[in-house]
Amino acid sequence: MKNKRLGVSLLEALTLLTVSACSGEPGTESAPASSTTSSASDQDLVRTQLDRAVDKTAKKYHAQVGVAISAGDATIAAGDKGEGPVWSTIKVPIAIAALKDGADKSLVDLAIKESDNDAAYTLWSQVQWHEGSADKAVGDLLDAYGSHADIHDTAFGYSTWPLKDQAVFGAQLPCIEEADYVHKVLKDIVSWQKVGLSKEKQTRAKSGWGLDEEENEYTYRQFGVHEVAGKRVGIALSVVTDGENYAEAESAVDYLAHQLVGIVEAGVDEGNIEPAAQCEDR
């Protein structure tokens, strides 16, 4: 992502590089659910629709594509698992962890709305200062809400956070007390970053994108939450295209996100997806 400042420290430069780069073999997976109000056949129907959206996007853009949704106790994924670098989507839990430690909201505005790397690094440093280990604090935050990631201890953009786990955390965003402000500003992403899920109604999302120079692949990821009448569905997606073509990846994300939100809305309307309406005490 764009970093307009110069003269950073070596550590900060490394961190910013890995995020500003803000990057599996396709497969289909459904995360196990111990209990859910939607039946197995309902989930199979939704999974089939997700598979179709993934296949259409992959063929149209010659891309590796993955999606995941989380509603209630059920998490359904299709396509690529999204186990590459998480890029700037990791700024969401970093901002939440920093707010727990009293971070300035203006830094959250910059890190989330504009995906500013300097602001994200400052938030990360604040968590490190207060908690002693920023990577552990962010990882513990995710674990507390049933989402799991391998957080890189310095270059946080290279953390690994699979799509199904991002979707799980996305569904919990409205329920995390310290995430209230992050949830709010996710609706105010700057115009040039209003791509894919961020364009869709009743959907709040954070993007992350980057180039893998060794593989010559460009990755665009998003995760967030779709909310209707107080009910929430976590959503995550990833598109990996060949070469350095940001515009191609962005177009693929738009195409995929519109299908994904349509599947979620239809699934909720038809009772095939049963989103949570209340938050659990934690």
List PLM regions with ranges.
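N-terminal export and membrane-targeting signals
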Residues: 1-13
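Bacterial Sec signal peptide processing site at the extreme N-terminus
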Residues: 24-34
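Active-site SXXK
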Residues: 83-103, 111
